[in-house]
């Protein structure tokens, strides 16, 4: 592999881990994702991963007005820790060295996040899973992904989604929606395009970290993106 990027942050939604099951895990699909990531790590690419928690809990949506926002967000953070534990075990069964760093102290789950420690693990060849988002309510896991990418000095963020790029409108509702091959952060913000939330997009822009949005339906796309193949949309 002739990788275009040396160190990346891969953001995977919790819903993606469930695939067609919608909740919990589709371990056949999770294994395919982990195999694709491991193949890239084996070629020397340093990979950090942030996983959402939507396969277990979707924060305010699932709170339905009965759970306060702070509590709902903390429940979401715990859901990401559950996902990291599962994915870490799959990596280890595949023979990969995987580590969990958490934004909150959760004994038995992982070590407390420290940027220098994360970089040290990455340079050793470990796949590093970042759990519990940013550790603070009111911030999405997309924002946490950009924050961790900046802290580990990642060359790019790979935003693996259930859609194959950034569109001018929702392609599921508007058949005339056009997919962008490339788009600027400013245009994403000005047009309110559904890439990441505005906090995450602004943070990526401020730190000049390109974001590649692509479909995770075929996990092998991770390797293709790392090789520089033009898949999805690059936001920069």
Model-identified regions with their sequence ranges:
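C-terminal catalytic "cap/lid" subdomain
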Residues: 1-236
